[in-house]
Structure formats: structure tokens, C-alpha cells
Amino acid sequence: METGTFKVKSGLAQMLKGGVIMDVTTPEQAKIAEEAGACAVMALERVPSDIRAAGGVARMADPTIIEQIMKVVSIPVMAKCRIGHFVEAQILESMGVDYIDESEVLTPADENFHVWKHDFKVPFVCGCRDLGEALRRIGEGAAMIRTKGEAGTGNIVEAVRHMRSVMGSVRRVQSMSPDELSAYAKEINAPLELVLELHKTGKLPVVNFAAGGVATPADAALMMQLGADGVFVGSGIFKSSNPSAMAKAVVKAVTHYKDAQILAEISKGLGDAMPGLDIKQIDPDKLISQRGW
């Protein structure tokens, strides 16, 4: 099978199903994540809460940091590029990262176009708030989708909103008659062939993870029960008071997301979760989830 095809790339992402992907900024953190059972790590210079606090322009991480993290773990390593910054993506692909996240957490480089991901052999993950956004990214070649949530807040409300929106729209498409599909594709500005495929199969053609605001094992289990295939945890692990224990607990929560007794047990004695932000108190211009289109 030819490498770099959409089938191969989306197939690779399927292997992460049921897993937790953790943001890490040092080799030491990467080891903690791997030992806790993370299925992959996201190599960053700063976690989203620090990016949010610092303001200014957030760019791709220094390649040195990414290389150092790649050397110490055997699980897949992801890295972020800015929306539309295909040269950052080219650099990351040349370094041999396993996945690229075209991420709204970084400052967008292009306000009109996302990266054309079909040009790359490496699989991409992209964020979405609704089904239209998800299908537009898949149409551009994204091999994996995640909710945008509101990164760096420790507040799960936006991730819940985005997951409910996507899953509700998937159910709506399934119930439509074939003659409604073309008009609906136009309404949500999505490729018609993907809407037709969704109607036929009843599911997205790629894995759909939860991200943005996951701060506790209960948050992770909530997103799984809402239909997520797995969970990204950004600031929630290493901004908590006991990162190693929190990391292990979140991994267990994703595995046992339907068992309330296990969830209660693993939630004990974890110390303080990361400090949280009320979304309503954030200036609308500073909402990360609004980036992208």
C-alpha cells in the first residue's frame, strides 16, 4: 500500500483509539506520560495555559525540544504547527514527527487557508467546533479530528459543547433522506462526498478525540461517554499538583469511562487539579476556539 495516502494516515490514527495524548515540554515530562500509559505525547515549548497567559504570537516549538522528546520515548510524538503555516509543517515532517497538529492554540499564520494536508505523508490532526468544520478539515486531508474546546482553561464546557454538536449532527445526517443531503452539505459548507459517506456509514471517516479543558479523570470519562474516541490533555496533567498520579488516573479513566466505582477510586487523593478559568469571563477576542474556519 502506498505510504502517505489518506487511507494509510487515517488508519495510523485509528491505532490511537481509546488512548490519552498528553502535552509535554521536557524529556522528563515525556517519560512520566509514557510511564503513565499515554498512547502519544504532544511536544511543546509551553503548555496552552502558559501560551494563553503569555499572549503575543505563539509559534511552532524549537525543533531541539521536539528532538529531545523524540529521543526518550518509544510512543508516537506529535507536534503543533500554526494554522495555514505549511512551512512549519514541512519542517516537522522532515524531523520525523509521527503526527502534526494544525493547532488553533498557536497564533494562526493564514486567515484564509488551512494547510492542504494531502500534500504530506505525515498524518494531521485538526480541531473542530461542529460537523461542518470537521468535514472541511477531513476534506483537506486531516487524518484525525478533535474538539477545540477552550485550551488552557481547565474548563470542560466548550469541549462538551463541540462534541455534542458534532455527534448530534452525525445523528441528524443519519436520519435524513438522500434528497436532503446536498442542501445540508451546502448549509454546513462541507464536501458533499463526505456528507454522503457519513449518511451511509453513520460515523466520521476518521477518529474523533476530545481536547480543550480536560482537567480531571471525570472530565476525560465525560468526553468518552459523549462519544469521543480518546482524549488529549494539555495543561491538565503538568499544571496539577501531582502530575504523575493525575496522568495515571486520566489514562485509567479513559479505559474505564463507564465504571463509576473505578472512576471514584482513581479520583481519590490526586491533589489539586490545574487552576481553572470561567469561559464567560474571557474576552471574546481572546477565545482560542474561535481561530480557524
UniProtKB/Swiss-Prot annotation:
Gene3D superfamilies recorded: Aldolase class I
Catalysis: reaction(s): aldehydo-D-ribose 5-phosphate + D-glyceraldehyde 3-phosphate + L-glutamine = pyridoxal 5'-phosphate + L-glutamate + phosphate + 3 H2O + H(+)
SUPFAM superfamilies, per the entry: Ribulose-phoshate binding barrel
EC number: 4.3.3.6
Disulfide bond sites: none
Positions of D-glyceraldehyde 3-phosphate binding: 164
Pathway(s): Cofactor biosynthesis; pyridoxal 5'-phosphate biosynthesis
InterPro entries with a match to the protein in the record: Aldolase_TIM, PdxS/SNZ, PdxS/SNZ_N, RibuloseP-bd_barrel
Keyword Cell membrane attached: no
Any single biological process term in GO: amino acid metabolic process
Sites where the protein binds D-ribose 5-phosphate: 23, 152, 213, 234-235
GO terms, molecular function: pyridoxal 5'-phosphate synthase (glutamine hydrolysing) activity
Stored PROSITE patterns: PDXS_SNZ_1, PDXS_SNZ_2
Similarity annotation: Belongs to the PdxS/SNZ family.
HAMAP family in alphabetical order: PdxS
Subunit organization: In the presence of PdxT, forms a dodecamer of heterodimers.
Entry-linked PANTHER family: PYRIDOXAL 5'-PHOSPHATE SYNTHASE SUBUNIT SNZ1-RELATED
Function of the protein: Catalyzes the formation of pyridoxal 5'-phosphate from ribose 5-phosphate (RBP), glyceraldehyde 3-phosphate (G3P) and ammonia. The ammonia is provided by the PdxT subunit. Can also use ribulose 5-phosphate and dihydroxyacetone phosphate as substrates, resulting from enzyme-catalyzed isomerization of RBP and G3P, respectively.
Record protein name field: Pyridoxal 5'-phosphate synthase subunit PdxS
Upper lineage: Bacteria, Bacillati, Chloroflexota, Dehalococcoidia, Dehalococcoidales
